[in-house]
Amino acid sequence: MHKKYFIGTSILIAVFVVIFDQVTKYIIATTMKIGDSFEVIPHFLNITSHRNNGAAWGILSGKMTFFFIITIIILIALVYFFINDAQYNLFMQVAISLLFAGALGNFIDRVLTGEVVDFIDTNIFGYDFPIFNIADSSLTIGVILIIIALLKDTSNKKEKEVK
């Protein structure tokens, strides 16, 4: 018998991430002009006010109807997977919560303003990474956690087959 995990923790994670994402974007949008930047960690991290009406790296710029439809489908799918497949896997619940929060955070921006507020500007190993936000970070961490969970699950299944 597997332990069924408390979904309240996952809901709290999602709510916290969405609130943190929206508050940080609000602060940037109301205190900085687009293009304004200040250095936080020399040669590594800047806060730069930027807007993006596309997806990562600006792809599909201006395709708002597409983003609305896809995001709604993704949010519904994440709730479905959370309810049906993640009840007994806390790691997967956290991953899905982070994906949900990230998708919702950027969706809120698109609905309210038609663009996403980005502000985290990094230079990693000499690569000037595209400017992103908390929602994007949440999506990235969620994807990484799902990959880890799937690899772990595959590894556990192989171990059981050997025994």
Swiss-Prot record:
- Top-level taxon of origin: Bacteria
Instruction: Provide the leader sequence positions.
Output: none
Q: Does the keyword Membrane apply?
A: yes
Q: Which GO terms describe its molecular function?
A: aspartic-type endopeptidase activity
Q: Supply one GO CC term from the record.
A: plasma membrane
Its subcellular locations are: Cell membrane
Q: What is its EC number?
A: 3.4.23.36
> What does the UniProt keyword field contain?
Aspartyl protease, Cell membrane, Hydrolase, Membrane, Protease, Transmembrane, Transmembrane helix
What is annotated as the active site? 118, 136
**What does the record give as the reaction this protein catalyses?**
Release of signal peptides from bacterial membrane prolipoproteins. Hydrolyzes -Xaa-Yaa-Zaa-|-(S,diacylglyceryl)Cys-, in which Xaa is hydrophobic (preferably Leu), and Yaa (Ala or Ser) and Zaa (Gly or Ala) have small, neutral side chains
One GO BP: proteolysis
Tell me the membrane topology, using the record's own terms.
Multi-pass membrane protein
Membrane-spanning residues where? 11-31, 64-84, 88-108, 131-151
| Involved pathway(s) | Protein modification; lipoprotein biosynthesis (signal peptide cleavage)
Q: Main location per UniProt?
A: membrane
What the entry lists under PANTHER family is as follows: LIPOPROTEIN SIGNAL PEPTIDASE
Q: Which family does this protein fall into? A: Belongs to the peptidase A8 family.
Role description: This protein specifically catalyzes the removal of signal peptides from prolipoproteins.
Name of the featured protein: Lipoprotein signal peptidase
Gene from which the chain derives: lspA
